[in-house]
């Protein structure tokens, strides 16, 4: 950001040059040359900031993939790292679990506001607060919103909540953070990236090829999905059921995969050249 400001890149968009495209290309080439001087170096795992998201959940989400991510989160936090849990509407019905783990009264009150503000957002726009789970969730075996939310919150593990963030607010506290964003997969994952996540762990039982602006590790809740969509899925948590893989071992494998991706290994979406982003928009679009 400092380099961006020092080179006056914003001037291009203020129309202070005659040919915006030519000037922008010139400055971007300078920026690329500057970026090329960076060299990969070893850093401690405590420098990692990992977003956690689920989508297309099924009956195994709360049994395999989400608990695996939760245990991963605890492992990373114990090493001084940072995780981000978002998709606030998916917390409805299980929010007290997170509230009871807030590190102090201020964070507790922020978490209460986080939940209630999103409910007010639903009401303001005439939407049913509890219009969940989706038809796909029900087909996959989820019965109620509480069922879905209890699965969602498992991604947070058992660590104390150390931060509560507004939408796209940068992370400034290590440990488990809660982030205000909707349940929409791409909007929520993009919000994690905007808040500083270098990677997003995305659990799914129904399957989706989506990917966010940062490496998106897609974790299957069941082995059938992992087998059918091997070009989408990076990690098969379904082995906890089909192969009696201990949860702790699954979390350790996932932790190693995260380290590998942070070290340059490409996830399936990157290999396919697929990524996208979506900004959370409120109000009327004209």
Locations of regions flagged by a protein language model:
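Glycine-rich, mobile lid/loop segments that gate access to catalytic sites or pores
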Residues: 15-59, 64-65
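Short, flexible, glycine/charge-rich loop motifs used to bind or transfer phosphoryl groups or to couple energy/partner
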Residues: 2-3, 39-41, 190
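A generic structural motif
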Residues: 11-16, 87
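Short N-terminal secondary-structure initiator segments
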Residues: 1, 18-38, 169-185
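Single conserved hydrophobic/aromatic residue that forms the stacking wall/gate
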Residues: 2-13
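Anaerobic metallocofactor- and corrinoid-dependent redox/one-carbon enzyme cores
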Residues: 47, 52, 58-286
């Amino acid at each position: 950001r400092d380099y961006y400001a020092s080179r006056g890149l914003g001037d291009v968009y203020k129309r202070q040059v005659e040919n915006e495209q030519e000037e922008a290309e010139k400055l971007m080439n300078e920026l690329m040359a500057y970026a090329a001087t960076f060299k990969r170096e070893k850093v401690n795992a405590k420098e990692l900031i990992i977003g956690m998201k689920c989508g297309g959940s099924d009956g195994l989400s709360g049994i395999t993939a989400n608990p695996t991510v939760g245990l991963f989160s605890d492992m990373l936090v114990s090493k001084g790292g940072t995780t981000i849990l978002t998709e606030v509407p998916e917390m409805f019905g299980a929010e007290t679990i997170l509230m009871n783990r807030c590190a102090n009264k201020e964070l507790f009150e922020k978490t209460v506001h986080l939940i209630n503000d999103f409910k007010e957002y639903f009401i303001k726009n005439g939407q049913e607060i509890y219009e969940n789970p989706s038809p796909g969730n029900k087909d996959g075996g989820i019965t109620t919103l509480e069922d879905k939310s209890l699965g969602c919150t498992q991604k947070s593990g058992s660590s104390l909540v150390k931060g509560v963030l507004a939408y796209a607010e940068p992370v400034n506290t290590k440990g488990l953070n809660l982030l205000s964003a909707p349940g929409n997969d791409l909007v929520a994952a993009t919000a994690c990236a905007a808040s500083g996540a270098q990677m997003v762990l995305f659990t799914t039982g129904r399957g989706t090829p989506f990917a966010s602006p940062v490496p998106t590790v897609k974790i299957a809740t069941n082995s059938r999905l992992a087998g059918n969509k091997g070009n989408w899925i990076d990690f098969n948590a379904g082995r906890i059921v089909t192969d009696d893989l201990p949860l702790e071992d699954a979390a350790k494998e996932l932790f190693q995969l995260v380290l590998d991706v942070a070290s340059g290994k490409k996830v399936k979406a990157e290999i396919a050249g697929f990524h996208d982003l979506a900004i959370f928009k409120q109000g009327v679009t004209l």
